[in-house]
């Protein structure tokens, strides 16, 4: 496939070359641990599945094309992918990181990587001045979620990339919430893009995976080395499932966003809802940035209710929307981040950010939007 094809075509055909032996339309699952060597050191391109597997390679090549990158590496989870990226640096190195960030990323930085002498400063990455003020002589990279999980703040990636270039830093972007269908950070100046592929890329809540895509071959080789050295690989069966999910990424993302935009506007009209966080609302503080740097606003919403008890009642009463962590599946999922996805962050940090027990996060699925509205209403009011 050529890079000038539109996203709808790329997600369907990239990396899915027809099998030359039997004409199979789907890449085979190479469920194998090791490969025949014709003679000592003479292989057909693969020797051991930790260092490379044809099914995983097909996924990695396809995803590098979707993100307009040079090389991709697939990992056993999103956190494994993020950990491999941070391991590109060393003891004494410092990172500037979004203060509203996935709880697992926060835990990795503050409970694991800190033991290795790495440090992080958490700032509002929608504020360029805050990023610049946090940079020190030991800073090596800026790590940005945009939109952030769960408050949906949007960072100006081109502006941050400019700062990183001037200061000799790498820019790493977690693009999980928008996927490459809506946003391509590498085209905006990022050096590395990470994904929890468990979410929109898989799309069916049946695979756990992570991906890293690099802007250069050199960075891609460094990430691949970490993949091989640390062993956090994605297996062939999960690689195949992920490739299957990506084939329908375009139609799913369109429906996710269509539903989310309508739900977000509707939620703002409910007296029970104090505030709605969605970058597709025109009163969102970074609406103009989101509109400029992405092709869509995505399917994630968070909203605030009167208090934690009201939020609990809503979550307990829902019948169509599922109470579960994770996001990006075809079914709508809802949770209270303060009690689940971000519970590893200190209570005082969460409170300062506004991630409280009255905030709920909604991953909008592809159900009929009127059924989702009806479910939320009966959850809030106890009747349909």
Describe the residue ranges of each PLM region:
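PLP-dependent enzyme catalytic core of the Aspartate aminotransferase-like
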Residues: 119, 133, 137-140, 252, ...
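C-terminal core of ALDH-fold dehydrogenases
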Residues: 4, 8-25, 309-349
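Conserved N-terminal alpha-helix of the aminotransferase class I/II PLP-enzyme fold
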Residues: 34-83, 87-88, 104-111
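Conserved small-domain helix->loop->beta segment predominantly found in fold-type I
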Residues: 261-325, 345-351
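Short, well-ordered beta-strand elements within core beta-sheets of diverse protein domains
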Residues: 242-251, 298-306, 361-365
């Amino acid at each position: 496939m050529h890079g000038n094809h539109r996203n709808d075509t790329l997600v369907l055909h990239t990396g899915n070359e027809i099998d030359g032996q039997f004409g199979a339309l789907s890449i085979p699952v190479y469920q194998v641990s090791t490969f025949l060597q014709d003679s000592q050191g003479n292989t057909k391109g693969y020797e051991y599945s930790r260092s490379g597997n044809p099914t995983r390679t097909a996924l990695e090549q396809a995803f590098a094309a979707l993100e307009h990158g040079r090389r991709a590496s697939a990992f056993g989870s999103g956190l494994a992918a993020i950990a491999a990226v941070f391991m590109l640096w060393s003891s004494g190195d410092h990172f500037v990181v979004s203060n509203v960030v996935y709880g697992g990323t926060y835990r990795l930085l503050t409970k694991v990587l800190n033991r290795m002498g790495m440090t992080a400063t958490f700032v509002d990455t929608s504020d360029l001045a805050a990023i610049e003020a946090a940079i020190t002589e030991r800073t090596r990279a800026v790590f940005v979620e945009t939109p952030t999980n769960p408050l949906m703040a949007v960072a100006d990636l081109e502006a941050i990339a400019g700062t990183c270039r001037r200061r000799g830093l790498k820019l790493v972007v977690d693009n999980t919430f928008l996927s490459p269908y809506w946003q391509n950070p590498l085209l905006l100046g990022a050096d590395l893009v990470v994904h929890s592929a468990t979410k929109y890329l898989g799309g069916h809540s049946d695979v756990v995976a992570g991906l890293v895509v690099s802007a250069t071959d050199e960075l891609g080789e460094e990430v691949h080395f970490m993949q091989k050295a640390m062993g956090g690989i994605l297996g062939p069966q999960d690689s195949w499932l992920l490739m299957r999910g990506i084939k329908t990424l375009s139609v799913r993302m369109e429906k996710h966003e269509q539903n989310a935009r309508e739900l977000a506007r509707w939620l703002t009209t409910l007296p029970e809802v104090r505030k709605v966080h969605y970058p597709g609302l025109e009163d969102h503080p970074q609406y103009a940035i989101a509109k400029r740097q992405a092709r869509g606003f995505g399917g994630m919403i968070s909203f605030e209710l009167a208090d934690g008890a009201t939020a609990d009642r809503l979550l307990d009463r829902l019948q169509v929307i599922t109470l579960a962590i994770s996001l990006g599946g075809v079914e709508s999922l809802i949770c209270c981040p303060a009690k689940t996805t971000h519970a590893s962050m200190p209570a005082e940090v969460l409170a300062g950010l506004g991630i409280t027990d009255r905030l709920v996060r909604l991953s909008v699925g592809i159900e009929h939007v009127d059924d989702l509205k009806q479910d939320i209403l009966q959850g809030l009011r106890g009747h349909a």
